[in-house]
Amino acid sequence: DNKIYCGEGEPQYNNPAWLKETTWGNNGIRKLLRDHATANGTKPVTRIELAVKELNAEKAKNPKMYPDSIYQKKLSKLKAGELKDGKIPTLTVIIKPSDNASYKNMVDALDEMQILSIGTYVIDKLNADDLHLLKLRGVKL
């Protein structure tokens, strides 16, 4: 149905309200990931995005100082939360497409990980508990 459902933290398999519906793009899943705050109030995606923009600006000013190998190494450190002002916690995103998810939606989900410089994400299968939660939420599978 071209929809995204997501939850934060440990799944609450008997609480259909835990699962939130959102949309694709800047005002949907991207905003949700940007606005996610850790227990100490850090918004890791926003902080890492800013650091990547700074890295890209430095590379644009001095392209010879940033051959691809150096750029990729610095980018990997940023994605791991290693910022100039210290290490921050990062997000781990688990992508669980349903059997009727389209290839385009899967590619779009992976694109969001790249756009937001999310360094840790996995693709997993829906398990019985996930299916139960989706059914409680009224999601058509």
What is the role of each PLM region?
Residues 1-141:
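Long, low-hydrophobicity, acidic/polar, solvent-exposed interaction domains
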